[in-house]
Amino acid sequence: LNALVAADAVLIPLHCEYFALEGLADLVGTMRRVRGALNPSLEIEGVLLTMYDDRTNLGQLVARDVREFFKDKVFNTIIPRNVRLGEAPSHGIPAVLYDAKSRGAAAYVALAREMLARRAA
């Protein structure tokens, strides 16, 4: 709660799974209450779809529903489900250094570029 009171904006990473949508609804409700009482300038920087597996209907459904609700707040960059992303923290190394050529690392680099482009616009 303290972080939401102090923040200007929130980047919401969202696993492309059903229960994550419930957590997202709770977070949005909490943000609404914080905005109403303590931090009227709090906004959503963006929603980042993570752990996305395009081979599953659920992943596609969650991505579609989130895009319909949040529209342009959803980043175009999607972080795929990727083994190398899961391995990197166990070695204490950022994913972009652990395996810079992995799909996951490339996605995070693309996210950084997208965030910078949004801020410049």
Language-model regions: role of each:
Residues 1-83:
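Conserved catalytic-core segment of NTP-binding enzymes
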Residues 38, 104, 114-115:
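Short, charged/polar low-complexity linear motifs in solvent-exposed/disordered segments
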Residues 38, 92-96, 121:
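A general structural signal for short secondary-structure boundary/capping elements
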Residues 88-110:
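C-terminal boundary of histidine-terminating zinc-finger modules
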Residues 110-121:
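C-terminal alpha-helix
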